[in-house]
Amino acid sequence: MKKVKSLFLLVLGNTEISTIPGISVAGATPELTKITPVADAEYLFYEKPLTIDTIPVTPEGHPTPAIITKAARELSNFPILVVRGGTYLAPLIPHVHISNVVGRDFRREPALPEVEVIIERAKLLGKELEKIANEIVIGESTPGGTTTAQAILWALGYEAKTSSASPENPQELKEKVIKEGFKRVGIEKGGLKDKPLEALKEFGDPMIATVLGLSLGFGGDVVLAGGTQMLAVSALLKSLGEDLSRFMIATTRWVVEDPSATFIETAREIGIISYVAELDFSKSKFKGLRDYERGYVKEGVGAGGATWLAVKAGYSPEDVSKKVEELYERLMGLR
């Protein structure tokens, strides 16, 4: 059987952490962050989401990075498989169900007691996908996920600062929340450095557990399409003894250039290579897109990895940026 070269997976996740006021702008309000993952997934296949009538936006109205993934796919037509890692709602499109578990608020209780079951199921899926694809590119949509990622990285002993979908990265709030979680568990930074699954169980989210399982089950090349959240996955893989030479992170330059985060340093410390999508929205006629250049949104829904697939298919980052402009114009016309 002939395998497909690359299969794009979009893993959806929710965590109660996203409802802490001020921590996530991956939704117009903290409550709406619960719907963001399913809306992102639906928008990849339809003119607009089905669960909610508009695409996810930040409180200031900046469009979801799903628009980049959709643009790249419209150009290069790669196959997409949506995976429900653990969300409040099921997306109204065909998808693989791993769990309906939502990550708990780790200040109060362990975030993911179901970690083993989720990893096991995702591993099984990864093994099956190996029969049909040479490579998988895994993106994610998980509001609040940069906080869970930073908590895991800290628990494993990395001095990491993760990015945010806002130019005002709520780093102080993130650190306060993480420290409260560490206090509950009774650890300092690095306190779980030899216990990766414990770190994931205490502070993680279902997306990270699902991506970890997929990565362990699939024996071919894996592109982790995301910013600082995929650094947490990489750190867990390394800690579990995986050889990172078959892995690569694909992200956008907005994550790499984020002065409030440590993407390059942390990737180097973990020892994983990265591809950076050189997208540029500075000449867009829409403020919602131009503001990506001011540090809004940055990455998500596998935007960097989807751009990488389009580039591999012979398109340029400029082509992707142009297509994004077109899609945004179409959206504006639908209102």
UniProtKB/Swiss-Prot annotation:
Which Gene3D superfamilies does UniProt cross-reference here?
Answer: 3.40.50.10210
Q: Which PANTHER family match?
A: PTHR38811, UPF0284 PROTEIN SLL1500
Q: Which domain of life is it from?
A: Archaea
Q: Which family does it belong to?
A: Belongs to the UPF0284 family.
Molecular function GO labels: nicotinate-nucleotide-dimethylbenzimidazole phosphoribosyltransferase activity
**Record NCBIfam families:** nicotinate mononucleotide-dependent phosphoribosyltransferase CobT, PRK04447.1-1, PRK04447.1-5
Checking CDD domains in the record gives:
DMB-PRT_CobT
Q: Which residues cross the membrane?
A: none
| Record protein name field | UPF0284 protein PH0034
